[in-house]
């Protein structure tokens, strides 16, 4: 009998990651979160298997947005009826729904649209402040996930 039969549960166990979004570029942070939610950082990754981890993001209200994206980047919504195309700038979206929705849309756009999309997005917890209720569950913590010198210079105030 093989000794590996009962050990697959450890490989598929969900690890909790804590990421601080303070002064981190939105796109870089979203791509790293999407990779973690999919499980691409694990050696057992398979596109059809749900082997990703849980991600808790804090300090989302201080996320770094460079350039004039706040005024120029547009979000669209269409109801399906003729003439009902709505558009918002990133600044209007942040004022109306908060910075959490900006990050959630960015991460959701980087995940593949398949049957696992909803399950992966439910494992993403986003908070505006530094406090969150999952401190006991956190296994890995990243306070500056992007170590680019350019990002540090762009968002230092």
Curated annotation (Swiss-Prot):
<comment type="function">
    <text>Component of the mitochondrial ribosome (mitoribosome), a dedicated translation machinery responsible for the synthesis of mitochondrial genome-encoded proteins, including at least some of the essential transmembrane subunits of the mitochondrial respiratory chain. The mitoribosomes are attached to the mitochondrial inner membrane and translation products are cotranslationally integrated into the membrane.</text>
</comment>
<feature type="transit peptide" description="Mitochondrion">
    <location>
        <begin position="1"/>
        <end position="29"/>
    </location>
</feature>
<dbReference type="GO" id="GO:0003735">
    <property type="term" value="F:structural constituent of ribosome"/>
</dbReference>
<dbReference type="InterPro" id="IPR005823">
    <property type="entry name" value="Ribosomal_uL13_bac-type"/>
</dbReference>
<dbReference type="InterPro" id="IPR036899">
    <property type="entry name" value="Ribosomal_uL13_sf"/>
</dbReference>
<dbReference type="GO" id="GO:0032543">
    <property type="term" value="P:mitochondrial translation"/>
</dbReference>
<dbReference type="GO" id="GO:0005739">
    <property type="term" value="C:mitochondrion"/>
</dbReference>
<dbReference type="GO" id="GO:0017148">
    <property type="term" value="P:negative regulation of translation"/>
</dbReference>
<keyword id="KW-0809">Transit peptide</keyword>
<comment type="subunit">
    <text>Component of the mitochondrial large ribosomal subunit (mt-LSU). Mature yeast 74S mitochondrial ribosomes consist of a small (37S) and a large (54S) subunit. The 37S small subunit contains a 15S ribosomal RNA (15S mt-rRNA) and at least 32 different proteins. The 54S large subunit contains a 21S rRNA (21S mt-rRNA) and at least 45 different proteins.</text>
</comment>
<dbReference type="GO" id="GO:0005840">
    <property type="term" value="C:ribosome"/>
</dbReference>
<dbReference type="GO" id="GO:0005762">
    <property type="term" value="C:mitochondrial large ribosomal subunit"/>
</dbReference>
<dbReference type="Pfam" id="PF00572">
    <property type="entry name" value="Ribosomal_L13"/>
</dbReference>
<dbReference type="InterPro" id="IPR005822">
    <property type="entry name" value="Ribosomal_uL13"/>
</dbReference>
<keyword id="KW-0496">Mitochondrion</keyword>
<comment type="similarity">
    <text>Belongs to the universal ribosomal protein uL13 family.</text>
</comment>
<dbReference type="GO" id="GO:0003729">
    <property type="term" value="F:mRNA binding"/>
</dbReference>
<protein>
    <recommendedName>
        <fullName>Large ribosomal subunit protein uL13m</fullName>
    </recommendedName>
</protein>
<keyword id="KW-0687">Ribonucleoprotein</keyword>
<keyword id="KW-0689">Ribosomal protein</keyword>
């Amino acid at each position: 009998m093989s000794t590996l039969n009962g050990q697959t549960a450890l490989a598929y166990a969900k690890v909790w990651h804590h990421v601080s979004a303070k002064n981190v570029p939105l796109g870089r942070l979203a791509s790293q979160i999407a990779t973690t939610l999919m499980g691409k950082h694990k050696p057992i990754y398979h596109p059809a298997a749900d082997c990703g981890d849980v991600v808790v993001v804090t300090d989302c209200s201080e996320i770094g947005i460079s350039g004039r994206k706040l005024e120029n980047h547009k979000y669209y919504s269409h109801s399906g009826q003729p003439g009902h195309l709505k558009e918002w700038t990133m600044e209007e979206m942040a004022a109306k729904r908060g910075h959490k929705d900006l990050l959630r849309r960015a991460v959701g756009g980087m995940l593949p649209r398949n049957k696992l999309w909803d399950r992966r997005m439910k494992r993403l917890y986003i908070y505006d402040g530094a406090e969150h209720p999952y401190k006991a569950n956190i296994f890995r913590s990243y306070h500056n996930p992007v170590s680019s010198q350019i990002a540090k210079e762009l968002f230092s105030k």
